[in-house]
Amino acid sequence: MVPMRSDAPLKIIVIRRDNIGDLVCTLPMVTALRARYPDAEISALVNSYNLDVLKGNPELDHVYAYTKAKHRPPGKSVAGVYWDRLRLFARLRRERFDYAIIAGAHFLPRALRLARMIKPKHIIGFTEPKPGAHHIDVGVPYTLPQPMHEVEDIFRLLAPLGIEGTPPAATVVADAKEVVEARALLAKQDWPAGRRLIALHISARKVSQRWPVERFVALARRLHQESGAAFLLFWSPGDSSNPLHPGDDDKAREIVTGLGGIPILAYPTHRLGELIAGLSLCEAVVCSDGGAMHIAAGLGKPILCFFGNSDRKRWHPWGVPHVLLQKESREVTDISVDEAAEGFARLLEKTKGG
């Protein structure tokens, strides 16, 4: 265990620069840090694309975000992006952090570069026999003696700070204003009170994770017939022909049309905060492996998830009841409607009395 300062609360910054699911899987680390060091000043450094995952998080004192050039808003130059980044890191250096934690599996040179720009007293991270690893002065040699979840893997970085054991659940907090707007949309539907509200998230980045539209329609019909359920439909907005950011507008329209007479609200989410708020109102979630699945887990939602060519041991929903369906082919298209319906029934059994 590394020595701790005794004259003032610790100042710790957790760095995670990659995808939405990765960031959600870092949140148990933040919760454990707060439990072990309740008086510490705990911050996070993320990219602007993922920022909403951390908004309102009660365990964090400060959240800092930098913009990647590919995520810059319209009218913002690349030079402007880098100038803003330089100013941000000048500010972070003035904070004089005790520890910067590079939250990610393996030795991560790019994240290490960010940590060094902050100039903390100590850098905690995984090390491997690679150039630059010597800059991590509180190193944890990276080995993977057995398969483990992403949450468990990176949680090992807290051992130098005296934190070990089973990681807690992730905590994602929906923005109160976004939730009010989502509730207002639902209120306009004039659905009978007491219906089970189920989220259907139909988009997936990997082709092997995409469940066919007609099966979402058939599954929703069956779940409605069995319990009178209503649905919120989520997808990645946009045209499927867009080469840079293909979306699933066409699929969403097909599903809404196919479910004529069944209560379903199409809920396009152009911002991450909208997705978080919408999912927060649902009783359960049906989706493929991906960022939305991890957000749902962070919101504490029971999940029926479809896994294609993904490592279920590494990426299953963390800390919530779930049923994971994966075929030997590692193709989601091989999962039948019957299997999905049976999986959802098992999910409800898991949540009874919980």
What is the predicted role of each segment?
Residues 1-354:
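Catalytic machinery of carbohydrate-active enzymes
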